[in-house]
């Protein structure tokens, strides 16, 4: 059985965001910083974003951010989402049962303050 139109759209989107960027910019879905990232970090971030999009396939609205947060999307690949919200005790409900991974080399998961605020407001 072939992929759904949604799956094909997600695949296209992930290919687009992983394209080359100017050397002065860091693209979380393509680049690795050996000081902070696992070698497979871009693949992990794309996989995390794929899982997020599949979990919200029927969403009525989306949030769009202007730039990836330095301690959130930068490591998870998911806008407004820190590593603490996809793994461990603070894992968000939609992330449970999904193969979410951290991409940072840090001992503890990165926390993005704005991510905690955004998801707190969404949860009500």
Spans of features found by a protein language model:
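A polyanion-binding, active-site-adjacent surface
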Residues: 3-124
């Amino acid at each position: 059985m072939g992929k759904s139109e949604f799956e094909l759209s997600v695949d296209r989107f992930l290919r687009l965001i992983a394209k080359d960027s100017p050397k002065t910019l860091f693209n979380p879905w393509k680049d690795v910083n050996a000081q902070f990232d696992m070698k497979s970090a871009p693949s992990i971030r794309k996989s995390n974003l794929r899982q997020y999009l599949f979990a919200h396939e029927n969403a009525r609205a989306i949030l769009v951010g202007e730039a990836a947060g330095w301690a959130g999307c930068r490591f998870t690949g998911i806008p407004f989402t820190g590593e603490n919200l996809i793994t461990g005790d603070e894992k968000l409900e939609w992330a449970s049962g999904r193969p979410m991974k951290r991409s940072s080399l840090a001992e503890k998961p990165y926390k993005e303050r704005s991510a905690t605020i955004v998801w707190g407001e969404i949860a009500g």
